[in-house]
Amino acid sequence: MPISLEYLGPAQAPASVGDFYFLRHGKTDLNEKEVFVQGEKHWGVQGAGTNIGLNETGKRQAVLAGNVLRKLPISSVVCSPLLRAIQTAVIANIGCLCFEIDDDLKERDFGKHEGGYGPLKMFEENYPDTENTELFSMRVAKALAHAETENTLFVSHGGVLRVVAALLGVELTKEHTDNGRVLHFRRGCPQWTVEIHQSPVILISGPSRGIGKAIAENLIAHGYRMSLGARRVKDLESAFGPQSEWLHYARFDAEDNDTMAAWVTAAVEKFGRIDGLINNAGCGEPVNLEKDIDYKQFHRQWHINCVAPLRMTELCLPYLCETGSGRVVNINSMSGQRVLNPFVGYNMTKHALGGLTKTTQHVGWDRGVRAIDICPGFVATEMSAWTDLISSNDMIQPNDIANLVREAIERPNRAYVPRSEVMCMKESIH
């Protein structure tokens, strides 16, 4: 429900305000509390007089917001002095050197009602023992003057956000007012607009263990929203905990194309977009040219290492093109660049995977899609346990690959690297 003119009183936005960003703090326990009193819904009351920190959900929301904000041209950060706002700004790790606290960005003061529950009218109008709405609106308008410097970021509260929007004549939806949302207010002609910025959505196949698990953990820690596909969803729950608004699980069988289509459909239904695909699932079974070849085993390896990445790329490509900066990361191998053994199945399929990467790059380039082969040598996982050429301590570690994957996702379109060869032992350069 929009704030009324009566609520605002004489408050007006400064005339010289430029485009700016707004981040509502992450959730606290009070944000999640509701009760019914005589059939009327009451919400948890936390205003200027309630100085509590974020709960675990709120901390995660701050991490997600940070992923977005670090890519935006933030010129300065102006923050409410309340703990929940400061925690949000710190956890988001925005990386802006200009940081300021402004008391005028505090939430409205709800007096003796702080920490309890209140009806809707407490938040919508002047209510006994609460801060006068006109005075509240006037101090918010005063704080808004910081946006005379373009691309200022305000880190504040829901009530402050609603006043800001009302001062600028912008209508907010529930999605705009959710905790942890990054909003971009733009001065248009003739009116202001507001846009939501959310962290990218990345799909990873085979993330239950090894390299895939390290990649998923790394991206989650850096504020990406994730859709994870594995044969057994319970393995994902064991590895990453329950699903949430930013974490999605799906059944993925690299030998069953139907599971791939269902996964992509479910991910889009949940998040509304796909920004990146990481084809990680692979098969390293030793199909040996020096022995009788098991062609059933070879065809299985071909399907897992080549057909499944192709199908996933085909399914995701339309959504990746929509973003203007879609990413496809194929976890390849140095075995896709050179040959050191008779394992013809693995060597062939990894060379073929490189062909998929190049074709994806060719097809998607003009729509902003970039594809990369990440080609490690021996990685300290179960797949490399057979070799005695190098000790596990001297092998590439899974998180080394995870860091390279994240760098590939975040690298700009204008300076893309299509292949990364990762070595842990002396080899000739091809």
From Swiss-Prot:
GO molecular function per UniProt: oxidoreductase activity
EC number: 1.-.-.-
InterPro entries in the record: His_Pase_superF_clade-1, His_PPase_superfam, Mas1, NAD(P)-bd_dom_sf, Sc_DH/Rdtase_CS, SDR_fam
Domain of life: Bacteria
Associated pathway: Opine metabolism; mannopine biosynthesis
Family per record: Belongs to the short-chain dehydrogenases/reductases (SDR) family.
UniProt protein name: Agropine synthesis reductase
Organism, scientific name: Rhizobium rhizogenes
Name of encoding gene: mas1
